[in-house]
Amino acid sequence: MAAAAAAGAASAELVIGWCIFGLLLLAILAFCWIYVRKYQSQRESEVVSTITAIFSLAIALITSALLPVDIFLVSYMKNQNGTFKDWANANVSRQIEDTVLYGYYTLYSVILFCVFFWIPFVYFYYEEKDEDDTGKCTQVKMALKYTLGFVVICALLLLVGAFVPLNLPDNKNSTQWEKVKFLFEELGSSHGLAALSFSISSLTLLGMLAAIIYTAYGMSALPLNLIKGTRSAAYERLENTEDIEEVEQHIQTIKSKSKDGRPLPARDRRALKQFEERLRTLRKRERHLEFIENSWWTKFCGALRPLKIIWGIFFIFVALLFVISLFLSNLDKALHSAGIDSGFIIFGANLSNPLNMLLPLLQTVFPLDYILITIIIMYFIFTSMAGIRNIGIWFFWIRGIFLTQGLNLHLLHWQLYKIRRGRTRPQALLFLCMILLLIVLHTSYMIYSLAPQYVMYGSQNYFIESNMTFNGHRGNSTLSVPKRCDADAPEDQCTVTRTYLFLHKFWFFSAAYYFGNWAFLGVFVIGFIVSCCKGKKSVIERVDEDDSDLSDEEPSVYSV
């Protein structure tokens, strides 16, 4: 009877955690569909690129959703007084941990497939479609040829990960270093697991670079843009009218030189062509501004202006909360960690930060911690999007044709993709979701940086022996008191989350993340200063001479 009751309790705990995960999965799919449809170009919409973007972003978010499930399951193995629950014997605990680990295996394998095969293939397929009117078969062959390079990179990462030495320095004999070795060896020595962990950690490292560039800047730009608002449509239209008149005068001046029938010099012809292109752009902008000025949406957003200011102030406080927590966590690692050779593992909490204290408290009232982690992930996505929309997607583009004589590189340049609501091309949409996928992968480590104890052990406690001296009695009395689990806890008393072990199997990645966090803080400060110095944004998205994805008939989507 007792065994059956214990098994029933264990099943109930698993059902609760996985039911919440299932509901979150449905919410993620709905969010990704709405988000991608919001940004994709209506004129150049492609079914395959849309599905690819939705699927890849959803897989990354679902992987992040496993983090609170992992923490929930290890936390519910123990009571608040530090004792294990009746059903949480060694076999059941291992079964629960393996369930989460197999979930990570599956999702991370799908992510590798998306990043190194499917997304590049779809991207190159549409690049070939844009360049010439070749047949479908030729487009597929060329796309597969270019995708082969990404497959080779993935294979190299898997091979390096499978055989890279993980041995820690042997000149460390302290108890702490024995604990470090235990943490790195906890997942086992499977070559397949090491290969997958190394590949995902490499992608997470790329996600860290993307977060430093886009998320750190977006965390400062988003709230300040909300507070400052946009320029007046009427004032912008007046300025635009003055620019039109000035350009028309220049055109008339140049044309007047050829009234007597003499041909214009080459220099004047080039100038005339530039002024005519500029005039077309200004007139297109005039139509957009006129539409916006008379739009009911502009008036509605104007009425919501005080609410936007409040949201901007709120987001500034949220950004400061993250920055302070990250700074204190990194400072704690700098002062009290086991050093760079361990990946800056912390033994015990020396400097508390707000989020590290808040999350374990919220976990006692399920599912408040789940909600907070979801909010943190979504906040990172929206701030990343703010950074991407302000900076754009620059990338170095090298294309080659495989010939019998070898590889002939025929195109090498920098290219910028613009991200705008309802105007994003299929290739740009794929790049956008690729960057967001990498940033979301890095979010798991970012949450660990913000709340290291919570991500490692959740709300687990363990017993420690404390010597108590009582008045009126001789000698000391030993008393067992519960203490929050940390890296200094006995190995058999606290269960480490699979998330932590998977992302920290290679100490050198953890060391790189540590230095990346300092760079993140630095870019945030620089971005905050730059955002403060910049003026208000235009009421419409920028209209350029080469703006091929803006039709003359449709107004540009405007920012309010």
Where are the model-predicted features located?
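Extended, helix-rich structural scaffolds rather than catalytic motifs
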Residues: 2-238, 291-400, 404, 416-560
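Short, surface-exposed loop/turn segments at secondary-structure junctions
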Residues: 42, 262-272, 297-300
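Alpha-helical coiled-coil heptad-repeat register
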Residues: 234, 241-244, 248-251, 255, ...
